[in-house]
């Protein structure tokens, strides 16, 4: 996937899969002897907000490391191939992360991920402005080309769910793309989920400041009941934290269908597609749907021993294009 004349590769890790700087998580060390290996991917940082955010994931005093090996806000169902999380964008805020300096030392093209989370559009717009000003300040010190994934769809923040009018939703996304682009002329890739109507995605993709689309973020608990078999009770095990967002096996065919419909609707911008990739063959499903690249995330938890093969398969089948 080439954006602004920079090759960002054929496979990205989902934002947060390896933390804010690629430091990973304690369970990665446990799975490494069993074959967990991220070599050959493009790094995407965990989504940050402008200001420090407590979220639902307790962090150590360094501001980035989870306190618990098995956090209460993440539920893993290995046999079903499903992860449910209500992390809620816990983090130290953008200023802390830029000042840390580790992003600036990365040597390969990568993505930072950002989300504005204010209660109103006016507040979210101001957050985007201030984030863009920060980015502009530190951008000259980066060693490698960097893109920005703008998260518009985290279900644990529920910002997008508060904008029921698709037209207003598209207008807000375009406004934020425009203001960030005016400060930081870098590749911009909005991250949406399959609940985003294709017509909204088409309007966003038509914006000159949109360089690619990323789909799909996790799905809010209980959404798409005609496609996802939720529990009989309909009660989320993370109901006390707002319900959480689902990732894993059920999303693969839903994402593939969304990408196919996006292409039929005339969306020509590159699409980075992910959701439910748990084996190398799953990459072929999204490639067949006309995705330009893929992203892998929940496989690192659910099928860690397959991650290396998934990355290899993605690089093989997209390389020939």
Model-derived features with residue positions:
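Surface-exposed amphipathic alpha-helices with a cationic face
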Residues: 4-5, 101-105, 136, 174-184, ...
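Catalytic cores of alpha/beta
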Residues: 22-30, 126-132, 196-208, 264-265, ...
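Glycine-rich phosphate-binding active-site loops on the catalytic face of alpha/beta enzymes
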Residues: 42-50, 147, 152-154, 212-223, ...
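C-terminal helical cap(s) of enzyme catalytic domains, especially alpha/beta-barrels
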Residues: 52-75, 223-244, 287-288, 292-293, ...
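Loop-centered beta-sheet repeat module
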Residues: 9-11, 147-202
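Glycine/Thr-rich beta-alpha phosphate-binding loop at enzyme active sites
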Residues: 152-168, 201, 205-269, 305-309, ...
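N-terminal capping/small domains of soluble enzymes
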Residues: 1-126, 310
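Short beta-strand/loop segments at the ligand-binding rim of alpha/beta enzyme cores
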Residues: 8-13, 108-111, 181-193, 262-274
């Amino acid at each position: 996937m080439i954006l602004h004349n920079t090759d960002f590769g054929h496979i990205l890790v989902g934002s947060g899969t390896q933390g804010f700087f690629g430091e990973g998580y304690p369970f990665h060390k446990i799975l490494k002897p069993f074959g967990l290996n991220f070599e050959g991917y493009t790094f995407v940082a965990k989504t940050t907000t402008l200001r420090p955010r407590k979220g639902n994931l307790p962090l150590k005093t360094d501001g980035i490391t989870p306190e618990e090996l098995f956090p209460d806000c993440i539920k893993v169902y290995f046999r079903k191939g499903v992860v449910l999380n209500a992390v809620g964008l816990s983090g130290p805020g953008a200023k802390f992360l830029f000042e840390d300096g580790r992003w600036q030392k990365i040597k390969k093209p990568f993505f930072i991920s950002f989300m504005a989370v204010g209660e109103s559009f006016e507040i979210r717009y101001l957050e985007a402005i201030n984030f863009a000003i920060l980015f502009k300040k530190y951008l000259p010190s980066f060693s490698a080309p960097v893109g920005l994934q703008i998260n518009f769809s985290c279900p644990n923040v529920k910002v997008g769910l508060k904008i029921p009018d698709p037209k207003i939703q598209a207008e807000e996304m375009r406004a934020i793309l425009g203001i960030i682009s005016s400060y930081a002329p870098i590749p911009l890739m909005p991250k949406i989920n399959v609940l985003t109507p294709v017509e909204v995605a088409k309007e966003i993709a038509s914006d000159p400041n949109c360089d690619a689309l990323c789909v799909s973020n996790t799905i809010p608990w209980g959404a798409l009941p005609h496609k996802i078999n939720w529990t009989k009770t309909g009660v989320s095990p993370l109901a006390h934290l707002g319900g959480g967002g689902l990732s894993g096996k059920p999303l693969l065919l839903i994402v593939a269908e969304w990408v196919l419909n996006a292409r039929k609707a005339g969306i020509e911008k590159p699409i980075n597609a992910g959701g439910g990739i748990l084996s190398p063959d799953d990459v072929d499903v999204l490639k067949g749907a006309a995705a330009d690249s893929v992203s892998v995330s929940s496989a690192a938890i659910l099928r860690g021993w397959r991650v290396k093969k998934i990355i290899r398969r993605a690089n093989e089948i997209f390389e020939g294009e």
